[in-house]
Amino acid sequence: MQVGFFILMFIIGAIFGSFLCCQARRLRRREEKKKPLGSRSVCPHCGYRLKWYDNLPIISWFMLGGKCRKCRHKIGALEILSELATALSFALLSTTINLETAAPLDYAIFAITLLLTLSLTFLAIYDGAYGELPTLCLTFSAICAIILVILKQWTLFSIDGFSFNLFLPPVLSASLLGGLYLVLYLISKGKWVGNGDWLLAGIIGLALFSPWLSLIALFLANFSATLIMYPFVRGKNKKSKKIHFGPFLVLAFVLSLTFSD
């Protein structure tokens, strides 16, 4: 059962990844006050309206060689990276719940975690593509993180009653991860990390619930960013030393949450 659930979540994640990538492009066009793409997916280069078999997550991209079926212009890597990232995130998170022993509260926590992951993935896609983090999506992610904290403490609420001490670990976690990126932002005056990065880090820290997990996420985010971005930063044609940390923070969130047990 668990293996089947893993595969199912991978497929669902790939579908959502394709959807999130499309929505990121639509939002960008609205912000730039360009003509909207419409309700149907089209090639951004020739305007070819994609058929249903052109929209199969992951499969279509590889079958077409990452190119438009009509004009053969390269589609780019954003689509396939979005689909693979969301698919793998959902598949990994499926291992955090045991379908045979899970209680209703466990399913609620799992559902909110998936919703938060979708919101964070959208932020990662948008930040990676355009270097910005939409305020509305940041706010929605923060709300999901708060709900997740409440659900995780629900059992303790019913046993011990309300206490501010119950919120101390997630608050410390958010302050630690968000605070460190805020310091980097202030020291560099926005040259190293963006204004939204420390907010995103704080939200992720809150959702991780533990200061120790925040430290692990901090290491994973910075290590992966250094590993991937170092060749670009060292290159002669570099435009900026500023790194978009959004994708790396979200990657660290999923990995930390998955292997926390």
Residue ranges and their predicted role:
Residues 1-261:
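A membrane-topology feature that recognizes alpha-helical transmembrane segments
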